[in-house]
Amino acid sequence: MHSSALLCCLVLLTGVRASPGQGTQSENSCTRFPGNLPHMLRDLRDVFSRVKTFFQMKDQLDNILLKESLLEDFKGYLGCQALSEMIQFYLEEVMPQAENHDPDIKEHVNSLGENLKTLRLRLRRCHRFLPCENKSKAVEQVKNAFSKLQEKGVYKAMSEFDIFINYIEAYMTMKIQN
């Protein structure tokens, strides 16, 4: 609670220091962010399309890793944390393993990771989109299921990356409308 009060004070002070009519670079990029989001999601989908077939062909499992409960977390009060944790999960656990499965896809997986890092950076700069601290149970379930699948977990997680992009889109659409 104290950290949110401190954050509010810092935001207020920053706003007071900025001259009228001139927004800070961060404010300007946050104002443009909702308009840039469809382009960022399209870029993620385009890069993913280059590796989608590879991972979906290797995914021989019938279960779903990214379940409806994760989407519900994205849409609920834990949306911010669920999104943040899932981005971190893909960047730190899934993609480093995915890069090592075939030299032909390494560059594309790396590019996908860079696009995801850019999205995360923009979300963090615009605090209204990613102001969170709580843990998501649905994300924990995804991580546990991923771990249990061992090597097959990479194929499963990467083959469902398009679902993850859809969940990001649902979360951001909800945030933009609020």
Swiss-Prot record:
Molecular functions (GO terms): cytokine activity
Gene Ontology biological-process entries: immune response; negative regulation of B cell proliferation; negative regulation of cytokine production involved in immune response; negative regulation of inflammatory response; negative regulation of interleukin-6 production; negative regulation of membrane protein ectodomain proteolysis; positive regulation of B cell apoptotic process; positive regulation of cytokine production
GO cellular component term of the entry, any: extracellular space
SS bond partners: C30-C126, C80-C132
Pfam family, one: IL10
Residues with attached carbohydrate: N134
Keyword entries, A-Z: Cytokine, Disulfide bond, Glycoprotein, Secreted, Signal
Signal peptide bounds: 1-18
Domain of life: Eukaryota
Subcellular localization(s) per the UniProt record: Secreted
Main location: secreted
Subunit structure: Homodimer. Interacts with IL10RA and IL10RB.
Family stated for the protein in its record: Belongs to the IL-10 family.
Protein role: Major immune regulatory cytokine that acts on many cells of the immune system where it has profound anti-inflammatory functions, limiting excessive tissue disruption caused by inflammation. Mechanistically, IL10 binds to its heterotetrameric receptor comprising IL10RA and IL10RB leading to JAK1 and STAT2-mediated phosphorylation of STAT3. In turn, STAT3 translocates to the nucleus where it drives expression of anti-inflammatory mediators.
Protein name listed in UniProt: Interleukin-10
Protein source organism: Cercocebus atys (Sooty mangabey)
